[in-house]
Curated annotation (Swiss-Prot):
Record EC number: 5.6.1.7
Gene Ontology CC entries for this record: cytoplasm
Protein name: Chaperonin GroEL
Residues that coordinate or bind ATP: T29, L30, G31, P32, D86, G87, T88, T89, T90, G413, N476, A477, A478, D492
GO biological process, one term: protein refolding
Subunit structure of this chain's protein: Forms a cylinder of 14 subunits composed of two heptameric rings stacked back-to-back. Interacts with the co-chaperonin GroES.
Enzyme class: isomerase
Amino acid sequence: MAKDIKFSADARESMVRGVDILADTVKVTLGPKGRNVVLEKAFGSPLITNDGVTIAKEIELEDHFENMGAKLVSEVASKTNDIAGDGTTTATVLTQAIVREGLKNVTAGANPIGIRRGIEAATTTAVEALKAVAQPVSGKEAIAQVASVSSRSEKVGDYISEAMERVGNDGVITIEESRGMETELEVVEGMQFDRGYLSQYMVTDNEKMVADLENPFILITDKKISNIQDILPLLEEVLKTSRPLLIIADDVDGEALPTLVLNKIRGTFNVVAVKAPGFGDRRKAMLEDIAVLTGGTVITEDLGLELKDATMAALGQAAKVTVDKDNTVIVEGAGSSEAISNRVSLIKSQLETTTSEFDREKLQERLAKLAGGVAVIKVGAATETELKEMKLRIEDALNATRAAVEEGIVAGGGTALINVMDKVAALELDGDAATGRNIVLRALEEPVRQIAYNAGYEGSVIIDKLKNSAAGVGFNAATGEWVDMIATGIIDPVKVTRSALQNAASVAGLILTTEAVVATKPEPAAPAMPQGMDPGMMGGF
């Protein structure tokens, strides 16, 4: 396949046109007065959103060289979203500013490598300065503030802060679509997995069709139970205690299931059987999680254990277990806090090393089920379009809040970036590296400039006054007032701000040091069949 190649200034300028098209589309959404962008969808109604990464992912340009520039900026937004969950528009604005200023200097004869070195040094200094002024976030009110700023809704802020308070910082908070118009919060305490009872005759509440087990023993195994004789000695021991039993196994079939059901119906003992959650290696890991949580042992051939030899000591325990046709919830497992803490640490270390997004998601779920619980924010809205937009805003707010709890907060609205300019300006560099530093200094102003512009103010006037104000005092674009940003609740998570700057500087440096761009030439369209020609003449049928 033939390739099209451009060199030097021609190559960079083509890519920068793509950068500008994407950035100009995304940056209109920045700030409290940011506008929306309407995205056409192949199916269904258009999507109206102000989420930077969602917009960036949708943009595909006809010119291959321009498209490469656009895709590099889209990568900045995606990377920032992956790391911090928010700040994608800020990252896009910073990238455009660094690229635009950098290109002017490279065109004027500056060495791109020297400029890149200066950009990297200035970015490192700015990030260190941001971390130095960060304030920790703790308490329900502070968390609600962060979420409210990100989502532009106090109500959403309250939902997220309550969810984090209920399930902890390591808990899973999922966002689902509600069937009604109201947004609501639902919290599931304890460990929940998506496996229900194997027989409806095991229920204890016929009206709700659920099985409630108070203070049960829990048998955990990765084996299939087909012969009741395999677990008969254990059942007899449990029967003596008059306590219910939950069986978690690969499957319960053959004569074993009807025997258990029959004894349940007769009232001999209260037993519920469910299939083990997950598949393959993940199933083994999840069974081990349940064992740690309940203080039991997984009966598995991997450890040389057999069901017929199992004793009461191998059984886990919990304060309560609730099983319906789809889910099982274990509340207040009897496992030791030390064992649970060690298991949590192990999962966290696996989270740090995994490169798979799917594995990361599953590990995060396992961590939440052990460490906290699961909260579900059910988003309601009048129309499907509003629902999609609201869901994206809540996802951003949740990610920003987690980032704030993790690394702290700084003054929002781009104020923190202006406040660290003195530290960057004091960086002693010379030649083209000094030019790179000055490019970053100019770029640090850009988020404030764009926020002001979107709110109908002159950015240069706002920036000039901001530079002469006390640290932390900034411009509230929503009201047009000058306020103490943190005290007013206008804050940005450090993780979001630094990730946006680091990713922007990284990709902008790559674009500026690009000397050749190779793109695939579009293939010429196949010639159309002459009108009136019979397909049968060409061997058609």
